[in-house]
Amino acid sequence: PFIKRIRQHFSMVSDNAVPTFPADKPKETLDYIAVLKATGAEMAVRKSFEVVEENTASDHRPLVADLALKTPGGKLMTHEPYLQDPRPDRMTVMFQTDAVCHAWVEFGTDSIHTQRARTIVGGQEACYDIENKIVLHDLKPGHEYYYRVCLVGLTYKRAYETHFGDTLTTRFYKFRTPSDNDTDFTALVFNDLHQNSKAYEALLKKTVGIDYDFVIFNGDCLPEPRDRAHAIRMIHNVTDPVGGAEKPVIFIRGNHEIRDFYSVGMHSLIGYRDGLTYGAFNWGDTRFVVLDLGEDKPDDTWVYYGLNDFTSLRNDQVRFLKEELRSRDFRKAARHILVSHIPVFANTDKYQPCTELYGSLLKGQPFDLALCAHVHETAFYEKGTGGAPFPIFRGGGPSV
């Protein structure tokens, strides 16, 4: 009767058939482990239980239990998803969960007739970590799509035993795929926010009423990530306010993104096209060419402790630029925009390897505009002024 009353409000963990008293020669079960059902973290799986053979520490033998507790459904995901790597025929949905989950995305041209997408790696669903990246394939250019994220917690997963937990389904979000036929679009470009929330809020107020198509964060907007939690927090601090769940976001590395312990870890949280921090993409009839110019000081600067090799990265982009500038996508585009955090031209740093590396390649190319940042001083250079081979707009710093 005693155990029956306990089970009304508790989930039993211990094995009631194993005696625990007296410690030297146990004959009775007087010790129990139980979890209160009202805690909201209901016990899901008892992974192991043991009555320890300890005869002298107490007159009762100690109990040890290893438990796996469910994560409540409402806490499986506490951030919005964000769209990455937008293409006419695909879109990448990225999100982080607060527990490892069986995850998929339901999507379609309406919210009723949907199909399911998930990430399969070598025949297995990728459900071993809180980072999730799901690509929606076979989309039609210039079409509106609806999607939602669906989660089932994985409370316990081993070779021959899997226990599913609570579920969560987000609301439906919507996005529009780009089309090569688009001739007009609007993009928001932010740079050098440096976690200054007041500056970001002031800039966001200027965007009220603007129907934009995508957002570019042109460097130093995710500065110096200390660890994964800090990196995730910074990403959502900038993507959630601009509706990154419905407006694709393009992250460009600045020199502050590549500092601190977790800087390389950022790669798994950002949907870089083809896994590269530089590249090119089309939005409508416009070709964007993106460069990652690395740090603003030489690789052998003492503060880098011999761990950087941005010289190789810049040289790789020489080869990329040569191929890109003669590519069909570049040549057939009606407009061309060059984007980099550190300016190739209009840079005030003492260390300017990129002007020498890329200057001769870029001069004479049909770029309509270059967007850059880094200097923390807003400036516009007409073609032919200050050594600019095409118009250059340089964004300012985070002061308000």
What do these predicted ranges mean?
Residues 183-261, 270:
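Conserved, compact domain cores that house catalytic/ligand-binding motifs in diverse enzymes
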Residues 150-176, 229-326, 357, 361, ...:
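Extended active-site neighborhood of metal-dependent phosphoesterases/phosphodiesterases
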Residues 3-26, 30, 35, 132, ...:
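Conserved beta-sheet core of the metallophosphoesterase superfamily
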Residues 1-4, 22-28, 195-200, 223-226, ...:
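Active-site environment of divalent metal-dependent phosphoester hydrolases
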Residues 39, 58-61, 66-189, 208-210:
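Acidic, histidine-bearing metal-coordination/catalytic regions of metal-dependent phosphoesterases
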Residues 1, 12-16, 188-192, 214-220, ...:
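Active-site neighborhood of phospho(di)ester-bond hydrolases with catalytic His/Asp-centered motifs
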Residues 2-75:
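Metal-dependent phosphoester-hydrolase catalytic domains
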Residues 1, 34, 59-67, 95, ...:
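Active-site beta-strand/loop signature of hydrolases that rely on acidic residues for catalysis
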